[in-house]
Design a protein with these regions (language model features):
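Conserved cytosolic headpiece of P-type ATPases
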Residues: 1-745, 752-753, 766, 777-781, ...
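Generic alpha-helical transmembrane segments
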Residues: 723, 768, 791-805
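Membrane-helix interface and helix-disruption motif detector
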Residues: 782-788
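A C-terminal functional module that forms or caps the active site or interfaces directly
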Residues: 808
């Protein structure tokens, strides 16, 4: 059933309303629930509790969409002209194969991208327990309607957005939706804060989140696309996905080539007519010249180089889902990183411990019979599973793990002190207590908020001795609590008492009194050790790291300082922005503010999208990392979305362009290095192909002006499709240049032709064309045989381009500043292409097809010498460029 947009005012204000007021608005009796008649009416009004997303386009529609790329249009036009005007079907077939291959790759990538929205559907709870017609029923979750009374307990997936009516020690894990790193304590009190963020709505539970502890009764306030997950699905379906830098570069290159090709063809046509040549002849010459100017192999070579990059990245734990993402990573200027699980371990860990009057770090050795360890372990609901893994609330598992690290005999203590009674955690008193038999008496263990627990303590244990708790003790304990809280540690206190008996129905005010204070523990989700070093490397490469999290500002700021995102020892609050503060800003204000902000806290999915978009408005290439459902819209909005392979939801992975197999921020920096290498290698291939094609154009154009017939179409075709292709692919296997991570990221407005590449293409093309024309003239002067002159020009142009492949290993660096033969693939490609070129010239039958004459050994020496000279000329030009750049 299709969902209808009939959202009521009470649905938006449910978290602010008193329960009786809400139930009157909902018209739902809490004890009996809705009747079957009510349910039918509401299903007709509101529709189904399911995510409705736009229908995916068909494979054929996706395939046709790929042909809207400008470079592809140019290639198709070239194929058509080649086939119908000059009847060169070989060229047309090759071009069409290249275009179809690229289209297929694009379809595969788009199909993968749609997985994000599909994965959202898998989050839904299959069933829900509701009160209907005065009975408790189990129904399919898609049958829920607003006003349904739902029963929740530990282990349930919340089936819709709901306002709590009753809550018994309820904790809900909302990390995937809000980014909060620990389960949230829930209660039923109305929220007075206007426009409170979803992370601050303690009386609400949201579709797709997990109940980790306690029980509750709630009323459904939103279903399907009206839920918070539904809003995310809607943002995913309508996320703006801009073209990647590579796609923009190829578009610009295609347009530039079109203008150049049309201009050259027109000038050649007019010049030929002025020289008295026939219109039909000049039309064919112009078409041949235009087709020769197009680097037919560039899209295929780019695809191959990107594919090689994906393989290299996969070996380094970065799994690329879309090919252009490889190159986009290299251009990254800003990394908007989620905190939990990416910059931190997503594992609460005790870092500080206060006992025996001293605050110490976690490395301190604590005796296994210490009351602090015992209380932390016994007043605890976490368990070890069959594989020895701790299961339970992250705060509680952190306590048990700390005890295990201290070699505490966990199983022995559980057997020795079995739990016989308990006072569960309650959000009002913020304590939990358990009772355990101990000889003829009972041991009461209590843990909870330090300020609450300290009020109930009358004694303190130090060095095994119990004494009365003094006012000075209280001040010292609260002082240490404050110190840890300032470091964004979550602080819990532990205490104990010896009882004579256990009440059947224990009451806090009776049993949680006159306790013996045992100590404090401070815990945090710690930063990954390698993350700080990776952030420093990124900074050295000119890449800014920004933290975005659903956690509180104080916690986020502390972690950011420890990671080096913010400087230590300074007042950094001005560089931290909360979701509430962001909400007050217009898009224009945020666009101006983002360069100043390094940490965003308590943000919603909409905020994350706005942050990414604001950076993009500042002209930056943005990477966004995330693992939760709440990250998915921003992942899709970013120039490159980076998901987490271990902790990431299927939704976040589906919205990503790249997935980190190890969830490690360091891997992003490694991938940026690989991306820079890939861009550099594509740039080298572009420089190589365009300088080669420009050299051919110069040769043909000048020859036309001079009335020479220097190269035949079959010669150009052979060089473009054989001689050029193998070295261009091999250039994609070049190693990263030594300073690749010391350079600043390239600007978003830059292109393949920036930073000296265009100048290099022009002068190197002129060199290739000039040397080819020179040998044609030289052969004519000394050997007086037209066919031999054409052959020597053909051989020289081919060999020139093979030698030139080594020149483009670096735009400015000397070829001999290192090992010029360090790329074995380029060496092999050059030898293979040279062998094929030699083969068509000296092999009987084949040389007749190509209309060439085998030169003598001496003539080959001339060809080789002139071809090799391009290395000398380019080395001189590079030296001049380096001198000019230094002086500038």
């Amino acid at each position: 059933m299709e969902q209808k947009s009939t959202r009521k005012v009470w649905q938006d204000k449910a978290y602010q309303m008193e329960i009786p007021e809400l139930l009157r608005a909902v018209e739902s009796p809490v004890e009996t629930g809705l009747s079957s008649v009510d349910v039918a009416k509401r299903q007709a009004e509101y529709g189904s509790n399911a995510l409705e997303v736009e229908k995916h386009s068909s494979l054929l529609e996706k395939f046709i969409e790929q042909f809207k790329d400008f470079m592809i249009i140019i290639l198709l036009a070239a194929a058509a002209v080649s086939l119908f005007a000059s009847h060169e079907w070989h060229d047309a077939v090759i071009i069409l194969l290249v275009v179809v291959l690229n289209a297929i790759m694009g379809v595969i990538q788009e199909a993968k991208a749609e997985e994000a929205i599909d994965a959202l559907k898998e989050m839904a709870s299959p069933d829900a327990r509701v009160r209907r017609n005065g009975n408790v029923e189990t129904i399919k979750s898609h049958e829920l309607v607003p006003g349904d009374i739902v029963l929740l307990e530990a282990g349930d997936i919340v089936p819709a957005d709901m306002r709590l009516l009753e809550a018994n020690s309820l904790k809900v894990e909302e990390a995937a939706l809000t980014g909060e790193s620990v389960p949230v304590d829930k209660d039923i009190a109305p929220i007075t804060l206007e426009d409170a963020g979803i992370g601050d709505r303690k009386n609400m539970v949201y579709s797709g989140t997990n109940v980790t502890y306690g029980r509750a009764v709630a009323v459904v306030t939103a279903i399907g696309m009206d839920t918070e997950v539904g809003h995310i699905a809607n943002m995913l379906a309508h996320a703006e996905k801009t073209k990647t830098p590579l796609q923009r570069d190829q578009d610009r290159l295609g347009k530039s080539l079109t203008i150049m090709i049309l201009a050259i063809a027109a000038v050649t046509f007019v010049v030929g007519l002025l020289r008295g040549r026939a219109i039909t002849d000049m039309l064919l010459v112009s078409i041949s010249l235009a087709v020769a100017a197009i680097p037919e192999g560039l899209p295929a070579i780019s695809t191959i180089i990107l594919s090689l990059g994906t393989r290299s990245m996969a070996e380094r734990k970065a799994l690329v889902r879309t090919l252009p993402a490889v190159e986009t990573l290299g251009g990254t200027q800003v990394i908007c990183s989620d905190k939990t699980g990416t910059l931190t371990l997503n594992q609460m860990t005790i870092e500080k411990v206060y006992f025996d009057g001293k605050l110490q770090d976690r490395s301190v050795e604590i005796p296994v019979d210490n009351p602090l360890l015992r209380s932390l372990v016994l007043a605890n609901d976490s368990k070890l599973d069959a594989e020895g893994k701790l299961i339970g609330d992250p705060t509680e598992t952190a306590m048990v793990q700390f005890a295990l690290d201290q070699h505490f005999p966990l199983q022995e203590n559980e057997s020795r002190y079995p739990r016989v009674q308990e006072l569960p955690f309650d959000s009002s008193r913020k304590l939990m207590s358990t009772f355990h038999p101990m000889g003829g008496e009972f041991l009461l263990c209590t843990k909870g908020a330090p300020d609450q627990l300290l009020q109930r303590c009358s004694h303190i244990v130090e060095n095994g001795e119990v004494r009365p708790l003094t006012e000075e003790d209280r001040k010292a304990i609260l002082s240490e609590n404050t110190k840890m809280a300032r470091e964004a540690l979550r602080v819990l206190a532990a205490a104990y008492q010896i009882c004579n008996a256990v009440p059947d129905s224990p009451r806090s005010e009776e049993v949680e009194q006159n306790l013996i204070f045992a100590g404090l523990v401070g815990m945090i989700d710690p930063e990954r050790k390698e993350a700080a070093a990776a952030i420093a490397v990124a900074k050295g490469a000119g890449v800014r790291t920004v933290m975005i999290t659903g956690d509180h500002a104080e916690t986020a700021q502390a972690i950011a300082e420890r990671l080096g995102i913010l400087p230590m020892g300074e007042d950094n609050r001005c560089h931290v922005l909360t979701g509430a503060e962001l909400e007050m800003m217009s898009d224009e204000e945020l666009e101006k503010k983002v360069p100043e902000i390094s940490v965003y806290a308590r943000v919603s999915p909409e905020h994350k999208v706005r942050i990414v978009r604001a950076w993009q408005k500042n002209g930056k290439i943005v990477s966004m990392t995330g693992d939760g459902v709440n990250d998915a819209p921003a992942l899709k909005q970013a120039d490159i979305g980076v998901g987490m392979g271990i902790t990431g939801t299927e939704v976040s992975k589906g919205a990503s362009d790249m997935v980190l197999a190890d969830d490690n921020f360091e891997t992003i920096v490694v991938a940026i290095e690989e991306g820079r290498k890939v861009f550099s290698n594509i740039q080298k291939a572009v420089q190589y192909l365009l300088s080669a094609n420009f050299g051919e154009v110069i040769t043909l154009f000048v020859a036309t002006l001079l009335g020479w017939t220097i190269l035949q179409p079959v010669h150009i075709l052979w060089i473009n499709l054989v001689t050029d292709v193998f070295p261009a692919i091999a250039l994609g296997m070049e190693k990263a240049e030594p300073d690749v991570m010391q350079r600043k990221p390239r600007e978003k407005s830059s292109s393949f032709l920036s930073n000296g590449v265009l100048e290099s293409i022009l002068y190197q093309g002129v060199l290739e064309g000039g040397l080819t024309l020179f040998i044609y003239w030289l052969a004519g002067q000394y050997f007086h045989e037209e066919n031999l002159s054409e052959t020597m020009a053909f051989a020289t142009l081919g060999l020139l381009q093979l030698f030139h492949a080594f020149n483009v290993k670096s735009v400015f660096r000397s070829l001999f500043n290192g090992n010029p033969l360090d790329n074995i693939y380029l060496n092999g490609a050059a030898l293979l292409s040279a062998f094929l070129l030699l083969g068509v010239i000296i092999t009987p039958g084949i040389n007749q097809f190509f209309d060439v004459t085998p030169p003598s050994l001496m003539q080959w020496g001339i060809v080789f010498g002139i071809s090799f000279s391009i290395i000398v000329f380019v080395e001189i030009a590079k030296a001049i460029f380096r001198t000019v750049r230094k002086q500038a």
